[in-house]
């Protein structure tokens, strides 16, 4: 059976595969479109197996919320090169995965991989994409938050995405404030909302470092604990969101800024995803 340019174009539109791959698959399938699609899918699986384990330090991060803005999700689709990260099909699949995550609200990244997009699971769709792009592709991150108000932020270039969950008030001004706080999280990468959220092991490590530094500086032994505690407090101010100076007005902390927007407004939680991290 002769393979026509029309057949090749139809297969390309259905699969996104390259022209020569489509021609080869159609020839092997003797012009049967369905068999050709299956052959291309199997080729993708072979490429995926060969590429598995390669570092996916590039990629595309997305964040969004549902219609009521009380649930949000972040996904990151990882790949090997920035060239693939900028590919329209790659970004389209990432958007489909995010939309699916928001609609179905799976509990874990593994649950998300098993949900279906147009008859294929997310993982199968990614494997198919590997065959088309020719490099390792992974669903490298999936995070969700639910609260009274959830606000997304995507940094320019789609390498960094943030969700911030707010409680205590609603309204357009709260959403604007949430965007400001999300941008602060993107820029300064706090490790917790406040000191109560910092792991004990981190606190102990910071105290030990502060004591050692004070000893090297020749401080009296009787002053070591006070000095260490003072430096720990500085660490909290620099690394916990509520205590950080607000980037748009450093006369206020983030907590004070939110209180100024609405009494009782606080950050309930936040998520930050950096491609390749």
From Swiss-Prot:
Signal peptide: none annotated. InterPro entries: EF-Ts_dimer_sf, Transl_elong_EFTs/EF1B, Transl_elong_EFTs/EF1B_dimer, Transl_elong_Ts_CS, UBA-like_sf. Pfam families: EF_TS (PF00889). Keywords: Cytoplasm, Elongation factor, Protein biosynthesis. Residues 81-84 are annotated as: Involved in Mg(2+) ion dislocation from EF-Tu. It is found in: Cytoplasm. It comes from the Bacteria. GO terms for molecular function: translation elongation factor activity. One of its GO terms (cellular component) is cytoplasm. HAMAP family: EF_Ts. Associates with the EF-Tu.GDP complex and induces the exchange of GDP to GTP. It remains bound to the aminoacyl-tRNA.EF-Tu.GTP complex up to the GTP hydrolysis stage on the ribosome. Belongs to the EF-Ts family. This is Elongation factor Ts. It comes from Amoebophilus asiaticus (strain 5a2). The lineage of its organism: Bacteria, Pseudomonadati, Bacteroidota, Cytophagia, Cytophagales.
